[in-house]
Amino acid sequence: ACVGENKQCADWAGPHCCDGYYCTCRYFPKCICRNNN
């Protein structure tokens, strides 16, 4: 399963972002998925 926009994710070990999203830890300690565009 993948997670979508603004959902919590992990760069190294799931949950991972769905296609079209990337994981950012800019909001450390919470990493979230953001749209690639």
From Swiss-Prot:
* GO molecular function terms listed in the Swiss-Prot or TrEMBL record: sodium channel regulator activity; toxin activity
Secreted among the record's keywords?
yes
Which cell locations does it reside in?
A: Secreted
Q: Which UniProt keywords apply?
A: Amidation, Disulfide bond, Ion channel impairing toxin, Knottin, Neurotoxin, Presynaptic neurotoxin, Secreted, Toxin, Voltage-gated sodium channel impairing toxin
PROSITE patterns according to UniProt: MU_AGATOXIN (PS60015)
Which tissues show it?
Expressed by the venom gland.
Primary location recorded for the protein, binned into one broad class: secreted
User: Disulfide bonds, which pairs?
Assistant: C2-C18, C9-C23, C17-C33, C25-C31
**Could you tell me which residues carry Asparagine amide?**
N37
Query: What does the entry list under GO cellular component?
Result: extracellular region; host cell presynaptic membrane
* Written domain comment of the UniProt record: The presence of a 'disulfide through disulfide knot' structurally defines this protein as a knottin.
The family note in this entry says:
Belongs to the neurotoxin 07 (Beta/delta-agtx) family. 03 (aga-4) subfamily. Aga sub-subfamily.
Q: What does this protein do?
A: Insecticidal neurotoxin that induces an irreversible spastic paralysis when injected into insects. Modifies presynaptic voltage-gated sodium channels (Nav), causing them to open at the normal resting potential of the nerve. This leads to spontaneous release of neurotransmitter and repetitive action potentials in motor neurons.
Q: What is this protein called?
A: Mu-agatoxin-Aa1e
From what organism does this protein derive? Agelenopsis aperta (North American funnel-web spider)
